[in-house]
Regions:
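A short, charged/proline- and glycine-enriched loop
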Residues: 1-3
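Serine-dependent carboxylesterase/thioesterase catalytic core
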Residues: 5-11, 16, 20, 24-26, ...
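C-terminal catalytic-base region of ester-bond hydrolases, centering on the histidine
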Residues: 129-201
Length: 201
């Protein structure tokens, strides 16, 4: 098979955090490639660098948190970019209440960097032909708990409803906290299955 898979980690999280998932995918015959970016710098610039990083190919994409948002934004803005199958893990593509609460403080705005505007509410529609799968956590463990109770099901940082993409192929909910999602063996198995078949079940 030897298909490329681009892995993109979340805000404040090193690209190495995706290493266990990458190792699982490598054992399954994929070629993982980690894309690194700085959340303190321009997100638009990171989106363009991701497009350049994958230009000329049609890799699969897997992103956690802000990494998933970057993937979604890049592929939405570059309809001609090649892609295989896409999995977003705990990615708040329609905005993030916890992020907005954090941004209400000066230190929070500094921590969020240029990502702050992306956490405002917005719609997310998938209009490309490639299948897009979403994995969301429902175990309320994470930074968001320090910023007040999050309504509805959430992973401690991202609400399940914030991961909603109109046109997504499928979404699964797992009893995991936000930071543990990319390290979960269950998540890795689901990602592998979706990259092979375009579905989780």
């Amino acid at each position: 098979m030897n298909e490329d898979v681009v892995l993109v980690s979340g805000l404040w999280m090193p690209a190495a955090l995706m290493a266990p998932l990458g190792a699982r995918l490598a054992r399954a015959g994929f070629r993982p490639r980690r894309f690194a970016y700085s959340g303190r710098r321009s997100l638009a610039g990171a989106t363009e660098r991701l497009a350049a990083f994958t230009r000329g190919g049609a890799p699969h994409f897997v992103g956690h948190s802000l990494g998933g948002v970057l993937i979604f934004d890049m592929l939405s803005r570059h309809p001609g970019a090649g892609a295989g199958r896409i999995v977003l893990i705990g990615a708040p593509v329609t905005g993030c209440l916890a992020g907005r609460r954090l941004g209400a403080w000066a230190v929070g705005r500094w921590m969020l960097g240029t990502s702050a505007p992306r956490w405002q509410p917005c719609a997310a529609r998938w209009e490309r032909p490639e299948p897009l799968g979403v994995i969301a956590g429902t175990r309320t463990l994470g930074l968001g708990r320090m910023l007040g109770v999050l309504p509805g099901e959430n992973d401690g940082v991202v609400q399940v409803e914030e991961t909603t993409v109109q046109g997504m192929a499928e979404r699964v909910l797992l009893r995991q906290g936000h930071s543990m999602l990319p390290l979960s063996g269950r998540v890795a198995a689901l990602v592998e299955r979706f990259l092979r078949a375009g579905r989780f079940a």
